[in-house]
C-alpha cells in the first residue's frame, strides 16, 4: 500500500491524496487550494486516467472543488460520497464552474487591454455537469465496502 499527497501537503487546503493498494489507485478528495490562483493551476500533478475511483470525504470546496478538473483531464470512474455530500456537490460544483467561467472572461478582458495572454477557466459548467454524472451516493454505516 502506498499513500501519495498531491494536496494539503505544504498548505492546509487543497486536500488530494492517492491511495494505491491491490493494483488500484483511489483518490481521496480533489480540492481547491485557498489563497489565490497560483495554487489552482490548470494541470493536475498526476494522470487522471490512472485513477480507478474517487472518495470525497465531504463537500467543502477544499476537498471537492477540483473534481471537474479531474474529469476534464479524462477521469471517467465513480466518485463515491455520502448522499448529503452528493446533494451539496450538485449545487457547489455548478456554482463554482460559473464563477470559474466568469473570472476567466473578466481576466481575458483585462488582459486584452494590457496585452497579456489570456487564461482558460479552471473548468467549465459542462465539466461540472459531467462530474455530477459520476457521483455514486453511499450510505453509512462507515464500514461500507467500495
Task: Please report, for each region that a protein language model flagged, where it lies by residue.
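Eukaryotic helix-linker segments that join adjacent hydrophobic helices
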Residues: 127-141
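Catalytic core of the metallo-beta-lactamase
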Residues: 2, 16-21, 137-146
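N-terminal metal-binding scaffold of metallo-dependent hydrolase/deaminase domains
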Residues: 1-14
Amino acid at each position: 500500500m502506498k499513500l501519495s499527497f498531491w494536496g494539503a501537503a505544504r498548505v492546509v487546503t487543497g486536500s488530494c491524496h492517492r491511495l494505491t493498494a491491490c493494483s488500484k489507485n483511489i483518490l481521496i478528495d480533489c480540492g481547491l487550494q485557498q489563497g489565490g490562483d497560483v495554487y489552482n493551476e490548470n494541470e493536475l500533478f498526476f494522470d487522471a486516467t490512472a485513477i480507478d475511483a474517487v472518495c470525497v470525504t465531504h463537500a467543502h470546496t477544499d476537498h471537492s472543488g477540483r473534481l471537474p478538473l479531474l474529469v476534464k483531464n479524462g477521469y471517467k470512474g465513480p466518485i463515491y460520497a455520502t448522499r448529503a455530500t452528493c446533494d451539496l456537490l450538485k449545487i457547489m460544483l455548478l456554482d463554482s464552474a460559473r464563477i470559474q467561467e466568469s473570472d476567466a472572461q473578466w481576466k481575458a478582458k483585462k488582459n486584452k487591454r494590457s496585452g497579456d495572454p489570456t487564461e482558460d477557466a479552471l473548468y467549465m459548467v459542462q465539466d461540472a455537469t459531467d462530474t455530477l454524472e459520476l457521483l455514486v451516493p453511499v450510505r453509512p454505516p462507515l464500514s461500507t465496502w467500495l
